[in-house]
């Protein structure tokens, strides 16, 4: 017998009834809503002031000390890359399931799988995305798909409403509020999700057909503390221009070599912004994503590690559109690097607590992955310029800054270290069997200059406008 007007029955959740800023409200210490604490600001100002005084009083000794420290940092980063790439060869670096293993599961009852697709002003991608998700090899009645659209995004809403949505698909309108970010929209979708598992896809994504089934098998065959499995990402327009060639080489190295290596080492995984599959319950326990962090994926990967969970890599690919326009790429990379800066400051508010929760080894992984990569992008131009001045002009002043051991280590990093980083991109191309891109990977140092420019742009933006979300423009693939 049904109960009418049961006062204990919870009202159904709606987009306007849930709190998309739950993390910042309940755990402000884990949110980038405050980019830096007062203590962090004080320490930063004190370090910069101390450095300025040291340069004024002891310019040559200070420069020598900084150069020696940076050289040691480069040596450590080069060796670290060696360790990570070596670990990627481990058989447990990535979870694999053959078509035969998937077919052997049938007939079976598959769990309900929630899919979140945040979009903003992308009407040209709606039809492709709906068709791609509808064609995935997963029972139609077990898909819980939400197209997350901003309530004031009239053009994309119109495009979505013009389609006949398959069963299990629905449009969720996100009320307009600050901050206007992807993670805020995803938090609303998370509260309304009904599935046992949940995945994020971007508007232009083309996931492989059996990806959802592989994700289910990955969770079912992994230890209980595996809360996320990350699919590999790559691009379907690698040969559009030189920028997409460089971008594809970088992604191949990152998702096919470096992330599997980190997973094999049990390291904290900075998640990709798409195609990460979660246990919905655990994601809800962690209060979803930080709506104020512009690389909410990276931050969530760290929070998973701090909570005692792990992430595994899954051998399945989601194909995306690589940025083919220079300024769009700069904006996207600025956002990514700014998010890494946000993430580093958030989790370094209490370094001793972070060390205790992650453990010494994972704490070191965190510093090298989140802090080290960002730092190297910022200091690279300084050392490139010094190397250029030395080789062209051979000024005596520069030579005095590099005593024997520092010069030897610096020269090794300049030649051997840079070769290693280029070689990693070459290996990524080989792994993906995109041999034609290998010649372009040799020009990676030019790509690094672009990364350094966007890195310094990210630093400025972090202090001036930390929450701005410079959206990536899609739909730029040339039609054949």
PLM regions and their residue ranges:
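Membrane-embedded multi-pass helical conduit in multi-pass membrane proteins
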Residues: 52-99, 103-105, 368-464
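N-terminal signal-anchor transmembrane helix
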Residues: 79-142
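Cell-envelope/extracellular polymer assembly enzymes that use nucleotide-activated donors
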Residues: 111-114, 144, 284, 299
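Acidic donor-binding segment of Leloir-type glycosyltransferases
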Residues: 134-177
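Long helical/loop segments within the catalytic core of UDP-sugar-dependent glycosyltransferases
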Residues: 162-197, 209-294, 334-345
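The conserved acidic donor/metal-binding loop of glycosyltransferases
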Residues: 202-206, 289-292, 304
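Acidic donor-binding loop at a coil-to-helix junction in glycosyltransferase catalytic cores
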Residues: 294-300
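Catalytic donor-sugar/metal-binding loop of nucleotide-sugar-dependent glycosyltransferases
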Residues: 301-319
């Amino acid at each position: 017998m049904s109960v009418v007007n049961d006062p204990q029955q919870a009202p159904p959740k709606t987009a306007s009834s849930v709190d998309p800023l739950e993390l910042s409200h309940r755990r402000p210490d884990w949110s980038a809503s405050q980019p830096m604490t007062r203590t962090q600001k004080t320490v930063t100002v004190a370090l910069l002031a101390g450095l300025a005084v040291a340069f004024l009083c002891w310019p040559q000794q200070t420069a020598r000390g900084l150069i020696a420290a940076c050289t040691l940092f480069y040596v450590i980063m080069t060796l670290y890359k060696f360790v990570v790439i070596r670990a990627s060869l481990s058989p447990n670096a990535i979870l694999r399931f053959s078509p035969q293993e998937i077919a052997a599961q049938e007939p079976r009852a598959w769990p309900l799988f929630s899919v979140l697709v945040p979009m903003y002003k992308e009407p040209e991608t709606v039809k492709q995305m709906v068709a791609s998700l509808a064609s995935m090899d997963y029972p139609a009645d077990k898909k819980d798909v939400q197209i997350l659209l901003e309530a004031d995004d009239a053009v994309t809403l119109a495009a979505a409403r013009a389609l006949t949505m398959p069963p299990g698909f629905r449009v969720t309108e996100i009320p307009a509020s600050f901050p206007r970010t992807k993670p805020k929209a995803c938090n609303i979708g998370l509260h309304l999700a009904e599935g046992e598992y949940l995945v994020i896809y971007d508007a232009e994504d083309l996931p492989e057909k059996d990806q959802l089934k592989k994700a289910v098998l990955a969770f079912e065959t992994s230890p209980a503390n595996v809360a996320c499995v990350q699919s590999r990402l790559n691009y379907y327009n690698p040969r559009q221009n030189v920028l997409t060639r460089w971008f594809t080489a970088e992604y191949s190295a990152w998702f096919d070599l470096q992330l599997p290596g980190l997973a094999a080492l049990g390291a904290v995984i900075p998640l990709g912004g798409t195609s990460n599959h979660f246990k919905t319950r655990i994601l809800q326990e962690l209060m979803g994503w930080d709506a104020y962090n512009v690389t909410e994926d990276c931050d969530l990967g760290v929070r998973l590690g701090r909570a005692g969970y792990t992430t595994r890599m899954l051998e399945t690919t989601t194909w995306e559109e690589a940025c083919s326009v220079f300024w769009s790429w700069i904006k996207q990379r600025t956002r990514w690097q700014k998010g890494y800066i946000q993430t580093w400051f958030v989790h370094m508010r209490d370094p001793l607590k972070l060390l205790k929760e992650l453990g010494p080894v994972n704490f070191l992984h965190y510093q090298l992955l989140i802090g080290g990569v960002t730092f190297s992008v910022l200091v690279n131009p300084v050392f490139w310029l010094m190397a250029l001045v030395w080789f062209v002009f051979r000024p005596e002043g520069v030579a005095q800054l590099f005593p024997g051991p520092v010069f030897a280590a610096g020269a090794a990093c300049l030649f051997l270290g840079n070769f290693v980083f280029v070689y990693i991109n070459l290996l990524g191309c080989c792994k993906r069997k995109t041999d034609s891109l290998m010649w372009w990977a040799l020009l990676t140092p030019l790509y690094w200059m672009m990364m350094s420019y966007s890195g310094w742009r990210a630093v400025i933006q972090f202090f001036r406008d930390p929450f701005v979300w410079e959206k990536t423009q899609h739909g730029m693939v040339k039609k054949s």
